[in-house]
Amino acid sequence: MHIVTSTDILLPRAEDMGAWSVIACDQFTSEPEYWAAAEARAAEKPSTLSLMLPEAWLHTARADGADGRIADTMRRYLAEGVFQTVPDSFIYVERTLSDGRVRRGLVAALDLEQYDF
């Protein structure tokens, strides 16, 4: 096997991408109102918010049992067909920075047993 390879990619079937997507969990750590608004937007809809623990919640009661809830949600999303599978794929990403430069990236599978840095 190669160190970097294609893999089956799971993409959301979500009709409301505003509810599905949230910013990275390490952002807005001192702004709980952002996360409250994200929760309200997601409500009972499938959301990546249900698949992570925002750092803003790390030292709160919300962190208690979060790993189990997240794992349960992952299993439920798989069972309910929340995702569509794009087989044997890579994802190419472009992001334009505030200064106009473009960063490019590739999402791929990485065989950590083969990788040596």
Regions found by a protein language model. Give the residues of each.
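A cross-family signal for N-terminal binding/gating loops and helix N-caps
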Residues: 1-116
